[in-house]
Amino acid sequence: MNLTNVDHIAIESSDIAKSVIWYKNNFRCKVKHQDSTWALLGFENIKIALVTPGQHPPHFAVVDKLVANKENKKTHRDGIHYVYEEDPDSNVIEKIDRGTS
């Protein structure tokens, strides 16, 4: 394991467009990506991913440069490798390898 930093926090949203407007108005964040199923909001030191229910579990993500070497890794549509793990209380942690992305 080679953790470097927290990358993002993912929370569910039943209406991505409505949530993006709310976060922009209340936190003045930047929209890095948005479509009908998810959005990525940029803050100074972290990102928030808004996802539709059932798409991904609510979680926080940490960068782990060794994820690409794991046999159980999956690949997001943007090419980033990831694995989900759960702590003893079933909280979900995503480990991602941003590589050169």
Task: Give the positions of each predicted feature.
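Short, charged/polar, Gly/Pro-enriched secondary-structure boundary elements
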Residues: 46-50, 90-93
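Vicinal oxygen chelate
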Residues: 15-16, 55-101
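Short, Lys/Arg-enriched, disordered terminal segments
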Residues: 1-4, 100-101
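Hydrophobic residues on conserved beta-strands that form the core of alpha/beta folds
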Residues: 3-6, 57
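Core segments of cupin and vicinal oxygen chelate
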Residues: 1, 10-48
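Loop/turn position at the start of each blade in beta-propeller repeats
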Residues: 4, 36, 78-80
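Residues embedded in well-ordered beta-strands within globular domains across many folds
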Residues: 7-10, 61
